[in-house]
């Protein structure tokens, strides 16, 4: 009986194999049972992927535990993913930590590609992050940049950690435009800063073994990481629930009018449209998205930009010359001055090329697709190594050199249409907050170089400044 069953099984296997055409998969390094290629990924993820791609090609398939991952490492392949097959790769993969800490994907960044996502993203683009809305926050930006300059002046004769000052700047700006200035200080301010720091660290460095190898999911419980994530998620929700209730009370006492922060704007939209998708859970998810994305990536980008300027004295001299000529006789640089600063814009672009913070763009195939001749299965996660394409010597002249002049009179911009340069991503999932981030960064950098000259601590040289990166949510400066 068992022998007959064995023969039938072999026959069915061979018959089905003939019926199912073999797939043409992208090149892949050898893998081990269960863990796949996890053992080939080092702590510097972007460098590990670059080294593997140089051996196996710009489209490379890895198996990270149970997860098939397509690594994209060229501008041509990136264009295929983000333009030719943009809809197919319009999903974002969600880890167990993201699921807990970002409202189960009800936010903009991680929501599944659907009508809900389209409506929520449209609300963010047209109501929260439009050019007119970003401009309306100019007083907040100028006040917080003035506070930054004052804090640096108070410590000008001492060695200061400029990175911490820049983080404080972006945290204050984003807090004020998201939930209001009352969350900058006191108990609310401390709680806001604590939760922001905890969640940023968890999303960057909390890896669930169960995401990759479900059979080992018990390790996450044993280590306490799962319980810690769940505890923090509840604290975040309680904080946002409190902010939401405070805003509703303010609107009621002011007869429908509230502050012009993101939370108030979303509540007003819901009030005006009974059929809106903006229920309270959705509103909290969007506001938390704005806080996380606006603070973390903006501050990281700003720190890289300032470090790049300090490391390159010739660039600093040229930039100071431009900024100080345009701002001559003024006590500070204002936003109206920035449009005249072409070299400043080139410096910003070059910094975000060589030290790109969005170093890997995550996507997920929502259906089977043929990509550059290869068969990609539904559910395959995609990592676009923008760090590698921004340093590709076939696309950039002397790519390791920090040379802002390459962007003077260049058509390349931030909008995601040049696939060798994607500091804010591209396609349907491109970052909607480009104008918001650049408004903060340009004003801060212009005022810092306008007001101050920099020197390294005793015994150190500008060229010795460490510009290596540490992977997390973004690529952090070490």
UniProtKB/Swiss-Prot annotation:
The keyword RNA-binding does not apply. One of its GO terms (biological process) is coumarin biosynthetic process. Residues 357-361 are annotated as: Substrate specificity. Optimum temperature is 27-30 degrees Celsius. The keyword Transmembrane applies. Optimum pH is 7.0. The record marks 109, 293, 297 as: Substrate specificity. It is found in: Microsome membrane. It is a single-pass membrane protein. It catalyses: (S)-columbianetin + reduced [NADPH--hemoprotein reductase] + O2 = angelicin + acetone + oxidized [NADPH--hemoprotein reductase] + 2 H2O + H(+). GO terms for molecular function: angelicin synthase activity; heme binding; iron ion binding. Not inhibited by (+)-marmesin, psoralen, 5- or 8-methoxypsoralen and angelicin. GO terms for cellular component: endoplasmic reticulum; membrane. Pfam families: p450. Its cofactor is heme. The chain crosses the membrane at residues 1-17. PANTHER family: CYTOCHROME P450 71A2-LIKE, CYTOCHROME P450 FAMILY 71 PROTEIN. This is Angelicin synthase. It comes from Pastinaca sativa (Wild parsnip).
């Amino acid at each position: 009986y068992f022998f007959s069953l064995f023969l039938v099984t072999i026959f069915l296997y061979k018959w089905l194999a003939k019926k199912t055409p073999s797939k043409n998969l992208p090149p892949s390094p050898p893998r081990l049972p269960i863990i796949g290629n996890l053992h080939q990924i080092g702590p510097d993820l972007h460098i590990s992927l670059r080294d593997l791609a140089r051996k196996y090609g710009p489209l490379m398939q890895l198996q990270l535990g149970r997860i098939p991952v397509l690594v994209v490492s060229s501008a041509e392949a990136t264009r295929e993913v983000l333009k030719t097959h943009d809809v197919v790769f319009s999903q974002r993969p969600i880890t167990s930590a993201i699921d807990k800490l970002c409202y189960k994907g009800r936010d903009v960044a991680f929501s599944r590609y659907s009508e809900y996502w389209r409506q929520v993203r449209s609300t963010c683009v047209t109501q929260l992050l439009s050019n007119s809305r970003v401009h309306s926050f100019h007083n907040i930006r100028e006040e917080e940049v003035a506070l930054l300059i004052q804090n640096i002046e108070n410590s000008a004769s001492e060695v200061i950690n400029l990175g911490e000052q820049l983080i404080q700047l972006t945290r204050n700006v984003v807090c004020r435009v998201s939930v209001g200035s009352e969350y900058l200080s006191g108990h609310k301010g401390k709680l806001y800063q604590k939760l922001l720091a905890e969640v940023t660290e968890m999303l960057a460095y909390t890896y669930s073994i169960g995401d990759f190898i479900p059979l080992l999911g018990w390790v996450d419980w044993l280590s306490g990481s799962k319980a810690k994530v769940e505890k923090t998620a509840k604290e975040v929700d309680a904080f946002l629930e409190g902010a939401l209730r405070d805003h509703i009370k303010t609107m009621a006492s002011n007869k429908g009018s509230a502050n012009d922060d993101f939370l108030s704007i979303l509540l007003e939209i819901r009030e005006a449209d009974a059929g809106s998708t903006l229920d309270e859970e959705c509103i909290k998810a969007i506001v938390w998205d704005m806080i996380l994305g606006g603070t973390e990536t903006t501050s990281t980008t700003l720190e890289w930009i300032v470090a790049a300027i300090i490391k390159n004295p010739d660039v600093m001299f040229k930039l100071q010359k431009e900024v100080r000529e345009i701002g001559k006789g003024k006590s500070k640089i204002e936003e109206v001055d920035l449009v005249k600063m072409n070299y400043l814009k080139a410096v910003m672009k070059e910094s975000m090329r060589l030290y790109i913070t969005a170093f890997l763009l995550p996507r997920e195939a929502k259906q089977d697709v043929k990509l550059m001749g290869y068969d990609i299965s539904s559910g395959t996660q995609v990592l676009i190594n923008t760090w590698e394409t921004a340093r590709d010597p076939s696309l950039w002249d002397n790519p390791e050199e920090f040379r802002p002049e390459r962007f003077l009179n260049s058509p390349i911009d931030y909008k995601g249409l040049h696939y060798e340069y994607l500091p804010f991503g591209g396609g349907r999932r491109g970052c909607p907050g480009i104008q918001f981030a650049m408004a903060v960064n340009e004003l801060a950098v212009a005022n810092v170089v306008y007001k101050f000259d920099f020197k390294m601590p005793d015994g150190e040289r500008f060229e010795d400044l460490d510009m290596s990166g540490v992977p997390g949510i973004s690529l952090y400066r070490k």
